[in-house]
């Protein structure tokens, strides 16, 4: 079957903006790589989400370096950073803040919660009660907090990096599917390779690697990179390819609930940044493929049969990508 051809003559040439983007993005990834060694793919995915301005969900087993990765990212960018350790008894007011009566001045005052920072690390988000989870997830969507009828804006840029252990662990509350959709990407760190593990053990004097990195970018740099990313050319054939992938999630026999348009929009925004981070002014199909699992796997729900058969959402998306026809690059 003949596949649509992408007209490369329409593509934007790499300008000084794209060169600047490539250099700054690489600097950020290299800096975080000092904290989480040998994990370039998840670091690039997280950095992409930060530039887009989306939220990140890191899901992996205990001790794989989720919090280290999150703190490494936060410490690499000169922006306000707060960490919330989620526990079953944490209240929504502990996250967003409270209004209290100031007896000295005789008036009500608002005391900001830890969510008022540019980068918020929500550690072990699935250990908190659904009510507290909802409080954070509302801020993620609305970018503002309403307490006692008064609305307070959070700082910009505003990015939540949440970590969670897989559901098999005891004492956890599963994030609802609708709220999972609020995260731009979901990725995992995985255990380090053999040689990296040996090298880590050799460095006996470093207790906390995230503390050793210093900022290489400012908050304004992130906003500037976001502006460049929005000008990256994306061909209609690539847009159709993205829509075909998302539509395929709705017709797959193993998937009970497919991805919404939010997934297609997220994939488009991420692909632009991924292309620019590669030093290109245009998106190619591989950009979409590299990101599809991280962007879409948490937006779908498998059928009971597929789950019982041991399939994972990541495997399902990967296998599905092989069946969707890829547009070829024309000369």
Model segments located where?
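Walker A/P-loop
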Residues: 47-87
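Conserved AAA+ ATPase core "coupling" helix
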Residues: 92-96, 172-244
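AAA+/SF3 P-loop NTPase mechanochemical coupling elements
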Residues: 109-118, 147-164, 175-185, 262
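C-terminal engagement/docking regions of AAA+ P-loop ATPases
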Residues: 2-15, 19, 251-331
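Conserved AAA+/SF3 P-loop NTPase catalytic/coupling segment centered on the Walker-B
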Residues: 114-141, 155, 170-180, 191-199
């Amino acid at each position: 079957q003949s596949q649509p051809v992408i007209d490369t003559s329409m593509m934007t040439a790499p300008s000084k903006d794209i060169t600047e983007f490539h250099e700054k993005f690489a600097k950020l990834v290299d800096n975080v790589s000092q904290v989480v060694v040998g994990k370039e793919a998840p670091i690039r995915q997280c950095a992409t989400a930060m530039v887009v301005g989306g939220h990140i969900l890191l899901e992996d087993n205990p001790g794989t370096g989720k919090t280290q990765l999150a703190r490494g990212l936060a410490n690499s960018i000169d922006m306000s950073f707060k960490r919330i350790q989620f526990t079953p008894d944490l209240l929504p007011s502990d996250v967003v803040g409270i209004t209290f009566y100031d007896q000295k001045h005789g008036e009500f005052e608002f005391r900001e919660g830890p969510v008022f920072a540019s980068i918020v690390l929500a550690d072990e988000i699935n250990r908190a009660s659904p009510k507290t989870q909802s409080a954070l997830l509302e801020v993620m969507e609305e970018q503002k907090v309403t307490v006692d009828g008064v609305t307070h804006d959070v700082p910009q840029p505003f990015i939540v990096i949440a970590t969670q252990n897989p559901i098999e662990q005891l004492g956890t509350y599963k994030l609802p599917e609708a709220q999972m959709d609020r995260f731009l990407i979901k990725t995992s760190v995985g255990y380090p390779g053999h040689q990296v593990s040996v090298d880590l053990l050799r460095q006996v004097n470093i207790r906390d690697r995230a503390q050793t990195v210093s900022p290489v970018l400012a908050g304004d740099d992130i906003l500037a990179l976001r502006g460049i990313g929005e000008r990256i050319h994306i061909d209609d054939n690539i847009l159709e390819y993205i829509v075909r992938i998302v539509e395929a999630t709705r017709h797959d026999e193993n998937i009970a609930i497919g991805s919404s348009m939010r997934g297609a929009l997220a994939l488009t925004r991420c692909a632009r940044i991924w292309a620019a981070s590669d030093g290109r002014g245009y998106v190619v199909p591989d950009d979409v493929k590299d990101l599809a699992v991280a962007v879409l796997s948490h937006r779908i729900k498998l059928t009971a049969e597929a789950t019982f058969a041991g399939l994972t959402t990541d495997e399902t998306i990967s296998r599905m990508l092989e069946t969707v026809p890829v547009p070829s690059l024309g000369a």
